[in-house]
Curated annotation (Swiss-Prot):
This is Ig kappa chain V-III region 50S10.1. InterPro entries: Ig-like_dom, Ig-like_dom_sf, Ig-like_fold, Ig_sub, Ig_V-set, IgV_Light_Chain. The lineage of its organism: Eukaryota, Metazoa, Chordata, Craniata, Vertebrata. Residues 1-23 are annotated as: Framework-1. The keyword Cell cycle does not apply.
Length: 111
């Protein structure tokens, strides 16, 4: 299975500032020039919400302050400017190989 190592485990960011979350895969998640890396946001009592798919594409209705980048094994999620509503858990997920696997999560809070 592809192992995803996400960092940091927790992050506190001031309103209006930038939050950056990293995800490293144990092997490349690229295939046919597509990066099979996705990012999800999860709030307590709610299902995960898809923010970013294929490394850099925004999900439906996702605000422009969420962006993704990276290729191969190294990826990042950026949130800028940070808003109060962005307090949540964030997870990377690879969808190159079954079983699809998730990173351990990052808890994002307001500083």
């Amino acid at each position: 299975d592809i192992v995803l190592t996400q960092s940091p485990a927790s992050l506190a960011v001031s309103l209006g500032q930038r939050a950056t979350i990293s995800c490293r895969a144990s092997e490349s998640v690229d295939n046919y020039d597509i990066n099979f890396m996705n990012w999800f946001q999860q709030k307590p009592g709610q299902p995960p919400k898809l923010l970013i798919y294929a490394a850099s594409n925004q999900g439906s209705g996702v605000p422009a302050r969420f962006s993704g980048s990276g290729s191969g094994t190294d990826f990042s999620l950026n949130i800028h400017p940070m808003e109060e509503d962005d307090t949540a858990m964030y997870f990377c997920q690879q969808s190159k190989e079954v079983p699809y696997t998730f990173g351990g999560g990052t808890k994002l809070e307001i500083k």
